[in-house]
Amino acid sequence: MTGKKKNRHQKKSSQDHNNEPLTEIDQTTDETTTTTTTTTTTTEEETKNENTIVENKDEDKKVEESVQEKEEEKEKEKEKEKEKEKEKEKEKEKENNIEKEEEKKEEEKEEKNVEKEEEKEEKQTKTDDNMWNNEDEIDVPTVEGEIETDIKDEKKEEKKKVEKEIEDPNKKYFIKQKKIIKRKKEKKVKPQPVQPTPPVPAPAPQQSSGWGNWFSSIGNAVSNTITQIARVDLDDSDEDSEEEIMVEEDIEVSKKEYERYHRKKLGLPLSDTEDSDNDNDNGGDDNDNAIMNAIDNGVFKTADMIADSLYFAGSFLSSGFKTVQDNANIENVKGLTQEVSNISLDTKNKISNSELYEKSQKIASQMMDSSVDALESVGQRAYSMFSTQMKNKSNNDENNNNNNNNNQQQPQQQQTTSPTLSTSPTSPKSPTTTTTNTTTTTTTNTNNNNNNTSTNYEFNINESIFEAGEFDSSKCAEHFNITKFIQDIEKLSVESTMKAHQINRKVISTSSIKSSVDLVLNEIKELFENEELPENLSNSNTLSFSNIHIFEIEKKYREFFDKLQEFTPQLKNQSIELGLCRGLEKIYQLTAIGLELISTIASSIPDEKAPSDVTNNNNNNNNTGEWAISKSNEILFTITKITQDIKLISAMLTEIIKSKQTPNSRKLLNNLHVETTNAISYIQDTKGGFVNICQIMYLNEIKFSLKGPTSPISTPNRKQQKS
């Protein structure tokens, strides 16, 4: 009880104590507690905020992870789809492979069936052949495993049979040999012919304006005649014709021949004596056949040569000289004759001990000589016909031009001196018929111009042909006669080719200096065909020909080139289109005068003679070759000089166009380059024709030196010719 009272007393005292007013110390403690509570609340709020931030970050991460997972799932699905597609493709490939294998199997089956059919056919042919063979002939088995053993056994048995038969001295030996007999054919009942149309007679060859058509009409007439004759021959031959039949008969032979026959049949090797006997037995037949084949080949080869020459002449007369020049190359003719000689050499090696060889050799040589002579005569006749027609045509054209000039002389005096173009509104502008003084001189009959006096050439350098921007290269070439000069050079080249071939065949081929002559001819050819110029070309800068007309045209060329160098810079004062048009006209005019000079040189070269100091020298052949090469160098220098002059004028025009800088400058420069290239090609293409022309100059000198002394004609110096 006392304890409970004490507790109650303590509780009351504590309550009383709590109800008492606070002291200062108590107040301070309260303040500290309040501050601590506030700080704790702030820290709690901060921690809450941090927790919320962390939670937000975690949520963002979770969102990103979920997005990535979705993307990964999509990629996995895509990969699965790709794998499915690959599996499908593999299945398709398997199906295709299976189909291919099935096709291969079917093809193999078909091939096997074809092979079986072929084997059956072979068996049938073998059985048919065995009917004609010897009764004792061995049938080769077709079983794959036992073929070799069966063949060996059967060969042994056959050997024994042959030995037994040979041992009997009184036995006669027979072999079966195939023989061809002839019998008359049975007459065939010809059906009654339906009323045929009357045969059209073969057209007679008619000379047309084109020589190629004339040759083709001859070919048609010949072919129609041949077909008609062939038909008549076939109709006649059907009545009493014979057919050949192969039969077998028994022939008695000697013991050696019988043994050799069976050894050949069994495929056994023959002895050396039997080989030599066999060669001697068959040698006569082989030799005769070889001779006949050689003669036949020679005849056909010659016929081909003549046919080629006729075709070649037809193309020559229809298409011009250039095609003929390519086809009439000496190397082509040499190739044909070389083939015939090879055939004769092979025949000679085979049948050198035969008497028939001498006869065949004479026949072949006579045949070749006559065929080549015929070829040359055909070519020369065709050439002479064509050249005379061309001369007549050119003379008629000159007469017509002279008449037109005389008729137009009076109205031209009333007009201005500057030439004009045709100004018809419906037709394109073309050059007038009036030409400059530069093209009045041509190369016809240049051999007769040695005594002509030199003329003073006057050039109207301000002459115009085309209007600005209307330059036409083809019309300009015709205006300045460029095509005519080129045709003259090509014509001389073809004529020189034919003459060179004739001299080579008749004179050079039988002489002892053939090898040295061939060296000079090859050197001339390489000189013109080589793109690089020789080092000593500058030493040939002066012309030394016997034709005085060459030096007149050379003077004319130099005067025009000097005036053109003064005239070209003045084109800068005109419009760029007009200046280019005038410049191109002058380039083509310079080209025409250069071609006139080259053509005149070409026409005088075949008649050029070596000076006396060359022909009278002991070492005549070498000196003549050096003289011919020096002349060729002079021509090559002239061609090179004209080419460089054209390039110089073109370069001056290029500088004028570049200095003006117009929108059309690039186009105009391109046109200038194209036309300059065309003009240069006209000059450079003449080098190919000069190969044959210079070769015939050299061959003429060699021919005269071999046949006998000729009257020496010294080459005049240039100073003497000018005086």
From Swiss-Prot:
Descriptive protein name? Uncharacterized protein DDB_G0279979
Sequence ranges of Low complexity compositional bias: 30-42, 397-455
Which taxonomic lineage is given here?
Eukaryota, Amoebozoa, Evosea, Eumycetozoa, Dictyostelia
Q: Which GO terms describe its biological process?
A: positive regulation of transcription by RNA polymerase II
Composition-biased stretches (Basic and acidic residues): 45-129, 149-166
Biased composition, class Acidic residues, residue ranges: 272-288
Q: Which GO terms describe its molecular function?
A: transcription coactivator activity
Chain segments carrying region Disordered: 1-166, 181-212, 268-289, 391-455
The species is: Dictyostelium discoideum
| Assigned keywords, A-Z | Coiled coil
Q: In this entry, which stretches build a coiled coil?
A: 53-173
| Record's compositionally biased regions (Basic residues) | 1-12, 181-190
Q: Does the keyword RNA-binding apply?
A: no
